[in-house]
């Protein structure tokens, strides 16, 4: 069973294992929220995962309040991915970023974990009264587009930024 959890001292070794796998693969670690600081220092890393409303307000629109969750496979006691939920959108996130950033660790891809993880993130968005939810992916990232579509994503448009085409989807979380 999968569930979204916050980082704690107890599950920190699971994070280190996941981040080391990602680093060894040489792939970009996604979502960006989990690569902002060095994960090898628990206290510094933990404090970098959440941006409060007050901190976001002080940034004069450059940053938004967010929450970071790790996806725990409780049957295997394994972090299989992570999601970052942005509580609002600034101009940059409106065009390229969206409310949810998500990533599945390399060894766990192709198993439907992304679809389940996004479903759990959407439930959290509903709890936070975020609706509709914007999700964005590269046009070339077919698995991510499928994950969004399986979770009710409706394609609004495609936009190009810095030579990359991004697909923008909206998902209603409220009845």
Language-model features: locations:
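Conserved acetyl-CoA-binding loop-helix of GNAT-fold acetyltransferases
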Residues: 101-104, 110-123, 127, 146-150
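Glycine-centered small-residue hotspots that permit tight backbone geometry or close packing
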Residues: 97-103, 147, 153-161
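Conserved catalytic-core motifs of GNAT/GCN5-like acyltransferases
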Residues: 136-137, 152-168
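GNAT-family acyltransferases
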Residues: 1-99, 124, 163-175
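Glycine-/small-residue-rich active-site loops that bind phosphorylated ligands and cofactors
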Residues: 77, 92, 109-110, 140
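Conserved beta-strand-loop-alpha-helix junction that forms the acyl-donor binding cleft
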Residues: 135-143
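A short, internal acetyl-CoA/4′-phosphopantetheine-binding micro-motif in the GNAT/acyltransferase core
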Residues: 72, 86, 99-110, 138
């Amino acid at each position: 069973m999968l569930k979204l959890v916050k980082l704690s001292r107890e599950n920190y070794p699971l994070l280190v294992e996941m981040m080391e796998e990602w680093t060894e693969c040489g792939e970009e670690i996604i979502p960006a929220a989990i690569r902002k600081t060095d994960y090898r220092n628990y206290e510094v890393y933990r404090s970098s995962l959440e941006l409060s409303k007050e901190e976001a307000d002080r940034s004069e629109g450059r940053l938004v309040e967010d929450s970071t969750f790790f996806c725990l496979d409780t049957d295997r006691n394994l972090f299989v991915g992570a999601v970052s939920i942005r509580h609002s959108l600034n101009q940059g996130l409106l065009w390229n970023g969206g409310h949810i950033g998500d990533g599945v660790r390399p060894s766990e891809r192709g198993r439907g974990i992304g679809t389940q993880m996004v479903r759990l993130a959407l439930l959290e968005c509903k709890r936070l009264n975020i609706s509709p939810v914007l999700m964005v992916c590269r046009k070339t990232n077919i698995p991510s587009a499928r994950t969004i579509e399986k979770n009710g994503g409706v394609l609004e448009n495609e936009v190009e930024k810095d030579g990359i085409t991004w697909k923008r989807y909206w998902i209603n979380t409220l009845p």
